[in-house]
Amino acid sequence: MILLFFVLLVIAVVCVIKYVGYMNSTYYKVTKKPFLAMRTDVGTYGEYCIFKLLKSYENKGAKFLFNVYLPKGEGETTEIDVLMICSQGIYVFESKNYSGWIFGNEKYKMWTQSLPQGKGRPAKKEKFLNPIMQNKLHIRCLNEYLKEEYPIYSVIAFSQRCELKKIELVSAVSYTHLRAHETR
């Protein structure tokens, strides 16, 4: 019984530390998203993981914005997941907190996420927008909005829960998995 109490106490302390850390983070201060919403929404959690990996840049003067909506014409908008502004330029992050296998070609509008369904069952396949094209649109809209030239860098961040199986690139684009210190 004492061991169970001790385990529950340790779990409670860890949860409180994570909660307080989140509530004091720039991510929370900017988005106002509740802690449980961040932990239960896969997309929001991916954005928060990007911020956690980059938050040390705040000490060097970097500023962060999240879920930035920009006009793209005809009354429509496009959303940047994470924007980091620093002395080197502006970094535009597209977060893909996916699992499974990822297949894509830089030239194709849609990419595929393949999720295994168990032995003997076909994989479930989901289509999603090409993140390279998405970020090109974000950067074009950001340039039009700013009306000045700034160095802008595109970063596509996939979670460590997925495997980039076949990604075909034609331009000088590099990719890597974003490694968070904590997994789901």
Which residue ranges define each predicted feature?
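Catalytic cores of nucleic-acid endonucleases
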Residues: 96-157
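Short acidic loop-to-beta-strand element that houses the catalytic metal-binding Asp/Glu
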Residues: 78-85, 90
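N-terminal signal-anchor transmembrane alpha helix of single-pass membrane proteins
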Residues: 1-30
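A short acidic/basic microdomain associated with nuclease active sites
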Residues: 55-75
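A short, highly charged nucleic-acid-interacting micro-segment common to nuclease
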Residues: 32-49, 127
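Short, internal active-site loops enriched in acidic
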Residues: 70-71, 158-164
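Conserved small/polar residues in nucleotide/adenosyl-binding loops
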Residues: 176-183
